[in-house]
């Protein structure tokens, strides 16, 4: 008696429930089913990279890079993208349009000078596409955010509703950085790696920060699990032993990250820095002798 609206499953099947009041042998109803294919020519994956916090961030006036990948392989039209948020349109540097047969592009978005450190905005995309001799058409919410989210959190099926098709942009304090002390040691030596968080802006405080180390070869047996960062002391120390078979003279680049929620903010932030570990040993001694 009423028109029914359903979203069909991926295999195209639609199930109809026969009323319990229908008696055997009664006249059957004839269902007219019409299907409309919802085209998604302007849906893009946001490439979040390895960022576990799933945000882009920058200082007021700086630029951030968005990497977008189209869900379509071929384009017969030209597409123009405009990022916007609660503050209106964002200024874009460089080309913001995709020509024919191009589905991937990067473009730089400026963090407004008027935004203050600690503020958030949720970026969306407004897209316009047009063919020769055709009228221009526009869509909004053209991001497909689920892929980026699932790459980082595979055990969580969907992002929070507030983040669907939106990229959180966070305005960074001007001075928060991870500091690492230089490290050298020979094969078999036990060394320490000190990680500290330098904050020049006292208004920001990490809540339950964790420290992680990345880039170490497996044979170095550096713990993969994040460790507590001592807020009172302002640093964390990693102790590890350089494997005896490590070749002297080699240099290994690793990096440390400090992860935590900034006070009064909902989303996780990660700050990181790189450091090189120099392997000393007999080869160095021979060079000095020569």
What spans do the regions from the language model cover?
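Short strand-edge motifs at loop-to-beta-strand transitions and within beta-strands
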Residues: 2-4, 64, 103-107, 191, ...
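Surface-exposed loops/turns
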Residues: 9-11, 59-60, 100, 117, ...
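Short proline/glycine- and polar residue-rich coil/turn motifs
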Residues: 7-9, 96-105, 114, 226-236, ...
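Aromatic/hydrophobic beta-strand junction motif of beta-rich domains
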Residues: 66-72, 109, 193-199, 240
